[in-house]
C-alpha cells in the first residue's frame, strides 16, 4: 500500500489580506507574475508540463472517439472566425484559427470530457487553509489561446498556465463553493479571467473588471451534477466557464467596466454566503511567486477514467489482490463488498442513483460501477495470466487502468456489473474518515468471500496518483495512460508528447501547438 511522502515546498509568496481589495490585488499579482517574473523551481515546471501533457492526452482521446460535448463545441468553434485584428485560437486537430472564446470552450471541453485530468482538493495544512474545494486543470487552453494572441513563447506560456492553477488552487483552499451549491469550476473562471487579461496586456483596472464580471454575471450552480443521469453540461462546465472568462477579459480590455472590489461586495457570492463585516472578504488569499511555493504540488493525477474520490477504493482493491492472489480470478465468490468513505465523497459517488448508471458520465461518477468494472477487469487479467500481468503475479494499476472502453454502452449494461453492485454496501466512515480529508482520500474496503473469508484492506489515504504518493510510480502510470489514450488517435504518441511540452518552444511553435492531425477528427 502506498505510504505518505512528505515534500517541502520553498519560495516566496504574496498575501492578499481579507481587508483589502483582493480583486485588485489579484490583478497586481497576475501582472507581476507575468511581467516581472521571479525564478520558478524546476520541480514545479516539470510537474506543470506533465499535467499539461496528461490533459492533452485526455482531450485527443475524447475527440478521436467522437465524444458528444467536445465534438459539438468544436464544430461550433470551426464555424466561427477570429475577430478583426485577432489571431484567434486553435482547436485540437484543426488547421485554421477560430474565435478565441469558441476555441477555448472546445478545447477545454475535450480536456475535461473523460474526467481523467489533474485534480486538486484545496488543502494547505501548514497554513490552516483546508476548505477542500475540488478543482481540475481544465483551463490550460485559456493559456494557449492567450499565448497565441499575445505572441508568447513556451516558457512564458507555462507561466500563464501556472498562474491559472495557482489562483484557482488557492481559492479552493479558502472558499468551498460546493457548500453553497456552486460548481467548483467558478474558481477556474476567476483565475482564467485574471490570467487571460494579464497575458493580453491588460492593466490593473481591466483585470479587476474581468474578475468582477465573471463573479457578478457568470456563476455556475451544481444543478448540472444533480439528477439520476448526468448530462453533457456536467463535463462541459469548465469549458463554458472558460468561454465566459475569456469573453470577460477581452471585453474589459476593450473598455467595458465591470464591478470593482468584488470579493468584498456584500451581494457577491462570497459575502452573500459567508457574511462578514463591511470592508472584509471571508478569507485571506496567499499566492506563490517563486521557487516551489505553488498549489500545483497538492494536485493529483488520475491513473485512468474515474471520479478521483474513487482512487482510495481502487487502491484498496489493488492491495487486496496482492494480499490474496486468488481473489482477482474469483469475483463470483464475493458475498459482500463494504466500502467505507468520507464526506463529501459519500454524497457524490455513493448516491443511490449511481447504482444503476446508464450513461458514461454517470458511470464514471459511480463508485459501485467503478469497483464492479475493476473486479471484472481483474478477473479477465488473472484468467489470461502470463503476458497480461506486467511483471507481477496479481493485477495492479497497470492492468486495471480504466479506459474509455470500460464505460461503453455494452459494459455499462453487462449483467455482471449489476450482480456485483447488488453485493456492495457503501457506508460513511464517520468522523475518523472525514478528519483525514482533504489531506488524503480515506477509504477502506472489506470483502466477504466464499473461499477466502473476510478480507480487509485497512485504511487507504494516499493512493497512487495522489500528490503524497510514490511519484516515480505515479509518473510511470501517467505516461502509460497517455500512450493508451492516444493510441489510434495519432500516429506517434511519443512524438505528440514531445510536441506539446512547452519549455524552450518558440512563439511559432506555441501558436500551432494544438494544430496536429487527429485520426477521425475534422481538420476544419
Where are these regions (language model features)?
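Terminal-appendage/accessory-domain detector
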Residues: 2-132, 233-243, 250-524
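Residue-level detector of well-ordered alpha-helical segments, enriched
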Residues: 47-51, 138, 156, 160, ...
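Conserved, well-structured ligand/cofactor-binding cores
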Residues: 49-50, 127-140, 149-158, 183, ...
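Well-ordered alpha-helical scaffold segments within catalytic/enzyme domains
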Residues: 59-62, 142-150, 193-199, 248-251, ...
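Carboxylate/His-rich catalytic cores and anion/metal-binding grooves
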Residues: 85-88, 144, 151-152
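Well-ordered alpha-helical segments within folded domains of soluble proteins
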Residues: 136-144, 188-195, 242-247, 310-314, ...
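Short connector loops/turns at beta-strand edges and beta->alpha or beta->beta junctions
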Residues: 140, 166, 216-220, 288-292, ...
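Glycine-rich, mobile lid/loop segments that gate access to catalytic sites or pores
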Residues: 147-243, 247, 261, 266
